[in-house]
Design a protein with these regions (language model features):
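RTX-like calcium-binding, glycine/aspartate-rich low-complexity repeat tracts
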Residues: 1
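Histidine-/acidic-rich catalytic cores in large beta-rich domains
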Residues: 6-85, 96, 100-104, 108-115, ...
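Solvent-exposed beta-strand/loop surfaces of large extracellular or lumenal domains
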Residues: 90-96
Length: 571
């Protein structure tokens, strides 16, 4: 976790709080607290390891999770192993340290729609076994079901397990479900739609923070655990519409806005970044990017996301922000400017812009980065139109998401990896790419803010072509062993299998050959970056075509994913 003490530096002032804070009277929090207390109270001296109290899905929100209530006469270690009775799934193990008296142990990784065997053992000796029968997964999309559970298919099995990063693939679909897959593509955890699914991150205590469009348009933030227990409910004055980033154990950073209208004459949204103290739920700093960048520069891509008022200008659309401590910068991604930029953490002064050099006002020219090779030699001559076009098509990011820091402690150096969606790949319609001719990719950038240059040591995604083209959202996560988990998470196709865009005319040029129906077929991969070897691949789909007549104008947003991680079930 980050080492810079948040309170040791002077950040910009927060906005005045209206209703923001922790709702200590939230009914769901109070109910879950009572359920936990009741489960714990039921554990008596009779509930030894050989006679444990087993409670499946105690909160009604995590159907593949259970509690094991165990009374211990002394401190001891116990290994809990979970597997389906038929032994078709990989076992999930966790070593617990029991305390004297009652213990309530989360049992995670159950398999849906079958009998599960939970074995307690010590020193390789089984002590007791229990059986829990789980319900089927929720229904998938159909004429009667919208926002159903995804259909998951493994398209490349994990045949070289030794090269895989440990853990489970955690995925969140827009207003559908948060869930986790094992490396065989089997669902081993999910929470019900009582919780937001979209803006989803695990914090230091092992809990998750989430917001979504479906839950009061990103104004309700939930903190819950793998058992589906809600711990804290936050009321937000302004939307947390994208990418919550944990700064430290008690502080988060997230894109925000003036949801009820700006205090000036601008009619804009999604153009700020908020810092919030989790212990109080209050904002401690706010960065207003309308005072940093040019609000009049034409957006590309553009558009209005579901739930946004069309009369409000989404000129920047910040979808990711984080703190670079080495250089004391706030780094942010502005999708609608196709720009990643850095501002001074204390003064908000602009430090750099990673973007095509086209159409920026003269005042911003000094902040634009020059692409160079590994020797520092410029890759393009921007006095030539052909070089401008080449950089647009091959170097710069377009409509990017998920800017994630790569550690670099050298002063003046900023490294990150970004998901380059690739919308248009030009500011000129005549030079832009249609979705069937386009691609999305992940890109590693190294920014030298002393020299104002940027280098690109790695990219991946062109190999998939239009199969991986995602006109919005998507994510990736770098693993401890160097592997990269990447989710091409808005791959959408018409009834003829042609790649299409989420908002033609705004997210891409209009494709006259596109059909009238849409269905998502998202790609999850784990790759070894050195060889760009695909170690595992699975797809997620709704399995059900949507169209404007039956599903409304947003039908092309069939199924999307905003975040992907690979981590342990047990935090």
């Amino acid at each position: 976790m980050n080492t810079l003490a948040v309170k040791s530096i002077a950040l910009p002032a927060p906005r005045p709080a209206i209703n923001q804070g922790i709702d200590i009277n939230n009914e769901m929090v109070l109910s879950h607290t009572a359920i936990y207390a009741d489960c714990l109270a039921q554990v008596t001296q009779e509930n030894t390891v050989e006679n444990a109290l087993m409670v499946l899905n105690p909160y009604g929100t995590a159907p593949l999770s259970a509690y094991a209530g165990v009374w211990s006469l002394e401190p001891a270690e116990i290994l809990v192993t979970v597997q389906d009775v038929a032994k078709t799934a990989m076992p999930v193990e966790h070593l617990y340290s029991l305390t004297t008296g009652e213990n309530l142990l989360p049992v995670l990784g159950l398999v849906a729609d079958t009998e599960n065997r939970i074995v307690f053992s010590q020193a390789d000796t089984p002590l007791a076994a229990y059986t829990l029968t789980t319900q089927p997964l929720p229904p998938v999309d159909s004429a009667d079901v919208v926002l159903g559970f995804p259909i998951i298919n493994v398209t490349q099995p994990a045949i070289d397990a030794d090269k895989m990063a440990p853990g489970f693939y955690f995925i969140t679909h827009f207003d559908r479900y948060n869930y986790a897959l094992d490396q065989n593509g089997l669902v081993r955890w999910y929470v019900t739609q009582d919780y937001p699914s979209y803006n989803f991150v695990r914090i230091d205590n092992g809990h998750f923070l989430t917001t979504s469009e479906a839950k009061n348009t990103y104004l309700d933030m939930y903190e819950f655990d793998m058992m589906g227990r809600l711990y804290t409910f936050y009321n937000l004055d302004n939307q947390f519409h994208h990418s919550i980033w944990p700064w430290d154990s008690n502080t988060i950073v997230a894109p925000s806005e003036y949801t009820s209208g700006r205090p000036d004459d601008l009619k804009t949204n999604e153009d700020g970044v908020s810092v919030v103290d989790l212990t109080s739920g209050l904002e401690t700093a706010y960065y207003d990017m309308a005072k940093v960048l040019d609000t009049t520069r034409v957006s590309r891509p553009s558009g209005t996301a579901p739930g946004e008022a069309p009369t409000v200008k989404d000129w920047l659309h910040i979808n990711q922000s984080y703190v670079n401590e080495t250089n004391q910068l706030l780094i942010a991604s502005g999708r609608h400017q196709s720009a990643v930029f850095g501002v001074d953490l204390q003064t908000q002064a602009l430090r750099f812009i990673l973007s095509t050099h086209e159409d920026w006002d003269d005042a911003y020219q000094p902040y634009l980065l020059t692409p160079v090779d590994s020797e520092g030699v410029a890759l393009y001559d921007f006095s030539k139109q052909e070089d401008i076009d080449a950089a647009d098509h091959d170097f710069w990011t377009w409509g990017q998401h998920n800017v994630v820091e790569i550690a670099n402690d050298a002063p003046g150096m900023v490294e990150f990896m970004v998901f380059d969606n690739g919308n248009y790949r030009s500011r000129d319609d005549s030079k832009s790419l249609l979705p069937p001719d386009n691609y999305s990719r992940i890109v590693h950038f190294v920014v030298n803010i002393n020299e104002m240059t940027v280098m690109r040591p790695f990219e991946y995604g062109k190999e998939l072509g239009a199969r991986g083209y995602s006109s919005c959202v998507s994510a990736k996560a770098i693993q401890q062993n160097g592997n990269i988990v990447v989710h091409f998470a808005d791959c959408t196709f018409d009834e003829n299998g042609r790649a299409i865009s989420c908002q033609p005319g705004e997210s891409d040029i209009i494709d006259s050959q596109a059909g009238s129906e849409a269905m998502g077929l998202l790609i999850l991969q784990e790759i070894a970056p050195t060889e760009k070897t695909v170690l595992f691949e699975a797809t997620m789909t709704s399995g059900y075509y949507k169209n404007a007549e039956k599903n409304g104008e947003g039908y092309r947003y069939d199924i999307t994913s905003f975040r992907v991680y690979k981590m342990d079930l047990y935090a």
